[in-house]
Design a protein with these regions (language model features):
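RNA pseudouridine synthases
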Residues: 1-109, 187, 207-235
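Short beta-strand micro-motifs in enzyme catalytic cores
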Residues: 2, 133-137, 191
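Residue-level recognition of beta-strand microenvironments
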Residues: 48-49, 89, 127-129, 163
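Short beta-strand segments enriched for Tyr within beta-sheet-rich domains
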Residues: 69, 145-153
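A structural micro-motif recognizing beta-strand termini
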Residues: 87, 138-142
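Short Pro/Gly-enriched beta-strand edge/turn motifs at strand-loop
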Residues: 104-108, 119-121, 172-178
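Pseudouridine synthases involved in rRNA/tRNA modification
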Residues: 115, 132, 142, 152-235
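Long C-terminal interaction/binding lobes of large macromolecular proteins
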Residues: 124
Length: 235
């Protein structure tokens, strides 16, 4: 297996309009062989992250490893946690169970109102209130639907900051939000990934710190906040 820390802006595998510069292109340059189960355009790819999302991914080098990792994802044995800066004061401990499918009115979007949809479960583990307008949320997903966190947070009125597709652009709010205006992508980072090694069953756990672009925004927000605004909450 290979665990990578994908940068924001990088597409995972070749697709229309993205024949080069993808994660798969980079992997093939550095690795002699990858699992072939995903096909010619997706060698080794067991799961994906959106182009604008940074963070941890596990890649399979061999077919047997791919099959076992795919089973763990299917059986919801893989632990996946993200950090997201969201609008408003979101509540820690909230569980969102809302099926997701392709938006029939916009093929670029997913929706919780689609006719054809699949089960999706998201849990807000911990929340750090940055100021009255913004919260940093630690989020666990128990399923892996396309745009799942982005759709679910938007559906409860707390879209991810910087996510223009799901309503996370600039808002009229209380509190100093000037630092977020420099964001060029959704404030969403895959920060933790845990699974069993596909060969020997050892527990493997990886963590990734916020990348520079997100950390600089968060640090500036905290610097500008009043002490009474900063609060961490758990269920």
């Amino acid at each position: 297996i290979i665990v990578v820390n994908k940068p924001a802006g990088m597409v995972v595998h070749p697709a229309a309009g993205h024949d080069s510069g993808t994660l798969v292109n980079a992997l093939l340059f550095h690795v002699d062989d990858l699992s072939g189960i995903g096909g010619e355009k997706r060698p080794g790819i067991v799961h994906r992250l959106d182009r604008g999302t940074s963070g941890l991914m596990v890649v399979a080098k061999h077919d047997a490893a791919h099959q076992e990792l795919a089973r763990q994802f299917h059986d919801r044995e893989v632990e996946k946690e993200y950090l997201a800066l969201v609008w408003g004061e979101v509540v820690a401990g909230r569980r969102i169970e809302d099926a997701i499918g392709r938006d029939p009115n916009n093929r670029l979007r997913m929706s919780n109102r689609a006719r054809r949809s699949r089960e999706a479960v998201t849990r807000i583990v911990r929340v750090y209130h940055v100021n009255p307008a913004l919260s940093l949320a630690q989020i666990a997903i128990h399923t892996g639907r396309t745009h799942q966190i982005r759709v679910h947070l938007s559906s409860i009125g707390h879209p991810i900051v910087g996510d223009a597709l799901y309503g996370g652009v600039r808002r009229r709010v209380r509190g100093d939000i000037r630092p977020v205006l420099k964001l060029q992508r959704p404030f969403l980072h895959a920060a933790r990934l845990a699974f069993k090694h596909p060969v020997d069953g050892r527990r493997m756990e990886y963590e990734s710190e916020l990348p520079r672009d997100l950390k600089s925004v968060l640090d500036e927000l905290i610097t500008r906040s009043r002490p009474e605004d900063l609060e961490q909450t758990e269920p």
